[in-house]
């Protein structure tokens, strides 16, 4: 039986709109939905195999991108949100009733502070940036996926035109390393 990576990629990838203006994300409650408004498109959208990201039922991966913190606001039912793990670098805000993760925010000193992590699939609008790569691919093994199936997973991503990484994509890893180099004085702060 073929593996389900994620509903947004299982049957091919739909190209997003570079001029997409944004939209609302909704939790999965049947009524009184938590609504998060996003101005603009996501960036660095990718399939993520980590154990912390929210995944739809049956999917091995989440699809997650980032938006500037100032481009995200909770538009309805903020009282239904809770932080799942206050000690985590990415504080994931989820609906207390349905469990859907609406956004993740970093409040500590971190290379991605100022960016909020979101799942654009929770929107009813089409045009969000399509996935650009697959990250933390090997992490699905830690969650119970048999290691013998990893070649099939990587091949499926590659057939969709997505590179697979066991961390993040090289540009994002370079950003993290640059941040760290500046912080520890090895690189100019003006870089």
Curated annotation (Swiss-Prot):
The keyword Metal-binding applies. Zn(2+) 2 binds at residues 48, 50, 53. It comes from the Eukaryota. Its EC number is 4.4.1.22. Its cofactor is Zn(2+). It holds the Pfam family GFA. Zn(2+) 1 binds at residues 27, 29, 95, 98. InterPro entries: CENP-V/GFA, Formald_GSH, Mss4-like_sf. It catalyses: S-(hydroxymethyl)glutathione = glutathione + formaldehyde. Binds 2 Zn(2+) ions per subunit. One of its GO terms (molecular function) is S-(hydroxymethyl)glutathione synthase activity. The keyword RNA-binding does not apply. One of its GO terms (biological process) is formaldehyde catabolic process. Pathway: One-carbon metabolism; formaldehyde degradation; formate from formaldehyde (glutathione route): step 1/3. Keywords: Lyase, Metal-binding, Zinc. Residues 20-166 form the CENP-V/GFA domain. NCBIfam families: formald_GSH (TIGR02820), PRK05417.1 (NF003829). Catalyzes the condensation of formaldehyde and glutathione to S-hydroxymethylglutathione. Belongs to the Gfa family. This is Putative glutathione-dependent formaldehyde-activating enzyme.
């Amino acid at each position: 039986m073929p593996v389900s990576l994620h509903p947004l990629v299982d049957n091919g990838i739909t190209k997003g709109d570079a001029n997409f203006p944004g939209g609302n994300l909704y939790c999965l409650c049947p009524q009184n939905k938590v609504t998060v408004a996003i101005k603009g498109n996501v960036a660095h959208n990718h399939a993520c195999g980590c154990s912390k990201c929210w995944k739809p039922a049956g999917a091995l991966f989440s699809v997650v991108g980032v938006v500037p913190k100032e481009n995200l606001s909770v538009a309805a039912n903020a009282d239904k949100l809770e932080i799942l793990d206050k000690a985590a670098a990415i504080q994931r805000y989820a609906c207390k009733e349905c469990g859907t993760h609406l956004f993740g925010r970093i409040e500590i000193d971190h290379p991605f502070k100022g960016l909020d992590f979101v799942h654009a699939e929770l929107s009813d609008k089409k045009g969000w940036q399509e996935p650009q790569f697959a990250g933390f691919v090997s992490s699905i093994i830690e969650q119970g996926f048999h290691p013998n199936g990893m070649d099939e997973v990587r091949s499926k991503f590659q057939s969709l035109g997505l590179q697979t990484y066991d961390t993040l994509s090289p540009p994002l890893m370079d950003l993290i390393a640059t941040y760290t180099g500046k912080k520890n004085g090895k690189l100019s702060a003006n870089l």
